[in-house]
Amino acid sequence: MISYYFQGLALGAAMILPLGPQNAFVMNQGIRRQYHLMIALLCALSDLVLISAGIFGGSALLMQSPWLLALVTWGGVAFLLWYGFGALKTAMSSNLELASAEVMKQGRWKIIATMLAVTWLNPHVYLDTFVVLGSLGGQLAMEPKRWFALGTISASFLWFFGLALLAAWLAPRLRTAKAQRIINILVGVVMWLIAFQLAREGVAHMHALFN
């Protein structure tokens, strides 16, 4: 059964490594050393819920509800555009240190709310956990399925805590105005690229619904 665990671990790692809103947010909180371990834990726990739901039957709900899929997609597009705009606005600020200081003033609950939005309003999360993991894990018998799910969940915990701790460790180098500007530009551009990609998928979903 351990082979199913490592299959899940490898697949989970491959899906979580690319830069996305979740990873960008965890990285930024790590650089600021601001609730970064709490955010890593909440991201991992969110993945635990989503992965479990996808592998143990939740994928059917999303696949059988095209309107729900379209709603999730366009909600994600709106959020990613807003998130990317915020990152680019900070990067282009004439006083980057002042803009960064304003971000640092954010309270714990606002940071948690942003993390929840970054995770739960990201359509790629549902496609990865419900569609990809759901289709693969759903074909397994119950015992292998549990080991497969445990592997993918382990990948999330290892990655988010590793990313948060690494970013915090590199914070002295990454907190400079130049590094922050580059990071924010990179995050903003990536968020907008993902948003435009999702918008194309959203148009395809809407076209399928009305034809």
Swiss-Prot record:
It is found in: Cell inner membrane. Keywords: Amino-acid transport, Cell inner membrane, Cell membrane, Membrane, Transmembrane, Transmembrane helix, Transport. It catalyses: L-arginine(in) = L-arginine(out). Signal peptide: none annotated. The chain crosses the membrane at residues 1-21, 37-57, 68-88, 111-131, 147-167, 179-199. GO terms for molecular function: L-arginine transmembrane transporter activity. It is a multi-pass membrane protein. InterPro entries: Arg_export_ArgO_enterobac (IPR023445), LeuE-type (IPR001123), Lys/arg_exporter (IPR004777). The keyword Cell inner membrane applies. It holds the Pfam family LysE. One of its GO terms (cellular component) is plasma membrane. PANTHER family: ARGININE EXPORTER PROTEIN ARGO (PTHR30086), ARGININE EXPORTER PROTEIN ARGO-RELATED (PTHR30086:SF20). Belongs to the LysE/ArgO transporter (TC 2.A.75) family. HAMAP family: ArgO. Involved in the export of arginine. Important to control the intracellular level of arginine and the correct balance between arginine and lysine. This is Arginine exporter protein ArgO. It comes from Salmonella schwarzengrund (strain CVM19633). The gene is argO.
